[in-house]
């Protein structure tokens, strides 16, 4: 772009017809050097910013910088099971993720769920007696799992009128930390609104060495 500073790598020199020195510059070489330098800084567990570029059924692709694309698999988006990555993120959304794996071909796999807190950290944000909005994630014979935070879901009584993805209002009947269970009561199943929880980060920088959801 005119007027914008740009990096190049000098690959050689020559002379023009008047004898003046002409420098042979490569923008591509500068981009490769930038990419390699950036990759050298990335380690498994590193928390980095990224931007969602496109979404597939199996995950979301993200730009992690210097034009480097990484995969955020659907099962790494949160502890709660979702039908599609689009239930959690949108194209253009900026995220914080941790590097789950980087192989010898510099293919990078990301994870988001480890940054969204353990069961205890999420449960501490709620209290029995509250009424909150949740998203139905699974309807089973023995009950309905309803997400009240990306890494936290509770169980309500069976209800065949509910379906995955439905937004409902729920009353928190009890929170049982020793059993890691939350009992919910659906109080309004007709909210008629599509909802997606925004990420609530419990980790925003540094490097993850280990993570146990049940702690």
Label every model-predicted segment.
Residues 1-215:
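Single-stranded RNA-binding regions, centering on S1/OB-family and related RNA-binding modules
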């Amino acid at each position: 772009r005119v007027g914008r500073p740009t990096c190049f790598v000098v690959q050689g020199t020559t002379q023009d017809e008047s004898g003046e020195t002409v420098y042979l510059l490569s923008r591509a070489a500068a981009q490769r050097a930038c990419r390699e330098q950036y990759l050298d800084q990335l380690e498994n567990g590193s928390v980095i910013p990224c931007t969602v570029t496109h979404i597939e059924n199996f995950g979301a692709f993200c730009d992690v910088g210097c034009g480097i694309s990484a995969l955020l698999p659907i099962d790494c988006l949160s502890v709660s099971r979702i039908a599609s990555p689009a239930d959690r993120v949108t194209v253009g959304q900026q995220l914080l993720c941790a590097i789950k794996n980087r192989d010898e071909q510099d293919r990078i796999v990301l994870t988001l769920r480890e940054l969204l807190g353990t069961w205890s950290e999420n449960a501490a944000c709620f209290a029995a007696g509250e009424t909150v909005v949740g998203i139905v994630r699974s309807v089973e014979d023995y009950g309905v799992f309803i997400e009240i935070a990306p890494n936290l879901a509770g169980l309500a009584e069976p209800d065949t009128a509910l379906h995955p993805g439905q937004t409902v209002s729920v009353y928190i009947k009890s929170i049982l930390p020793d059993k890691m269970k939350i009992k919910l009561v659906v109080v309004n199943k007709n909210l008629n609104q599509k909802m997606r929880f925004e990420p609530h980060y419990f980790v925003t920088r540094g490097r993850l060495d280990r993570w146990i959801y049940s702690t």
